Amino acid sequence: MSRISKAEMSKLLSVYFIMGSNNCTKDPLQVLREALEGGITIFQFREKGEGALTGEERICFAKELQAICKEYGVPFIVNDDVELALELDADGVHVGQDDEGITSVREKMGDKIVGVSTHTIEEARWAIENGADYLGVGPIFPTSTKKDTKAVQGTKGLAHFREQGITIPIVGIGGISIENTALVIEAGADGVSVISAISLAESAYESTKKLVEEVSRSL
């Protein structure tokens, strides 16, 4: 197996759905299935925060979600937990700046997908040098899902990354909705990552379809 190509990674980032059990009011397995039917291109398991599952329950839940992703041939990424990603043989892992260092993550993950959240050009360059396949840049807009986020960057922050010669695939993160997706893509992102825009939608399927349309219209 060799590392994923830039072009392939860029395509996978189009509509990036992130979810844990506590992000849904409906059955999360059903929400994921609807999102996959609607056309998400990659999924990240993020079980964090108030009411999140722990221990064996968390692992079992992750396995259920992973099995559904496999049915649809969509990559399953684990947030912040390299050991779990390895245990599940996940397609990749996504880490933040405060998590395990990117060099050790790349070493452990081999050729699997490694994504890194970045807020500055320095962080971006460091992540690229040490093996990131893509960057998560944000928060672009205010978000209520993550309580520990950095200052909102707006689309200008994202455009700045491209102006500074960052060519690696980028997914926009934070407060992204159907209404503002086009702005994120136009600023230079390859795709959008969302939680509540799908997880709390009246119809996860319809909401995903609209996001997919917005992204392809704006690219």
Curated annotation (Swiss-Prot):
Cofactor binding description: Binds 1 Mg(2+) ion per subunit.
The protein's enzyme class: transferase
Binding residue positions for 4-amino-2-methyl-5-(diphosphooxymethyl)pyrimidine: 44-48, 79, 117, 146
CDD domains for this protein: TMP_TenI
Catalyzed chemical reaction(s): 2-[(2R,5Z)-2-carboxy-4-methylthiazol-5(2H)-ylidene]ethyl phosphate + 4-amino-2-methyl-5-(diphosphooxymethyl)pyrimidine + 2 H(+) = thiamine phosphate + CO2 + diphosphate; 2-(2-carboxy-4-methylthiazol-5-yl)ethyl phosphate + 4-amino-2-methyl-5-(diphosphooxymethyl)pyrimidine + 2 H(+) = thiamine phosphate + CO2 + diphosphate; 4-methyl-5-(2-phosphooxyethyl)-thiazole + 4-amino-2-methyl-5-(diphosphooxymethyl)pyrimidine + H(+) = thiamine phosphate + diphosphate
UniProt keyword Ribosomal protein present: no
Record-given protein name: Thiamine-phosphate synthase
